[in-house]
Amino acid sequence: YDLPKFGNVSLLHMTDCHAQLLPIYFREPNVNLGFGDQFGKVPHLVGDQLLKHFGFKPNSIEAHAYTYLNFEKAAQTYGKVGGFAHLATLVKRMKATRPGALLLDGGDTWQGSGTALWSNAQDMVDACKALGVNVMTLHWESTYGEARVKEIEEKDFAGHIDIVAQNVKTTDFGDPVFKPYVMKNINGIPVAIIGQAFPYTPIANPRWQTPNWSFGVQDENMQKTVDEARAAGAQVVVVISHNGMDVDLKMASRVKGIDAIFGGHTHDGVPAPVVVKNAGGQTLVTN
């Protein structure tokens, strides 16, 4: 699996594995409704519409990866997808051929399997460290409770993985719960990686799991964080987000100074980024 080398900053992105350590059969949806001005646009394209938009051939490996078409036959041909062992091989190869490359995790990683539940997320925490994750943000991770998340951050991840989330604050005084961003030097280029945790956690998940944390999209604070990172010398600013792609597209139109948003949550297989124009230029959004 070779990708052409270009540029001097390489960022690898994974998201929404939902604690699946082993390969699985995965079928893309045959319905993805877009409402209002998003109707018929990426990421709301499925089947033949998606193939046509991105120029993929029917019955190809790309067609199997990104659509539901001929799923049973394609699954027999190409087999299962995913698995941390295979992912580790790819990550090692990418990092070996791209010095300084970082692996970003968009969240929904620690929860979703029996072993993750029984081990209180420890199996996935250890797997992520072994995989070489560098920076991550959160959603279902918070279902383990505030104390467990902070314990993992302060003990397991210390010196290994940064948890970032500009939109998670304490409910009493509005203090940051996590670092809003981290600055990484990649081959001499200062790169700011901002975190955007799932904004609707308190209503999508039981509130008792995060009673002292507030969330929300917080576009204004995102702009403030971007400006702060730029003022600190960042030549590249990216966001690892768990908003969902439609929310990311809207955020990209409102916040200037973000080069790219690596999205998650909505599980939209997007082969190429969507270019969003804004007051500062443009932002690339993918999922």
Predicted regions, residues:
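N-terminal catalytic scaffold of extracellular/periplasmic and nuclease hydrolases
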Residues: Y1-N287
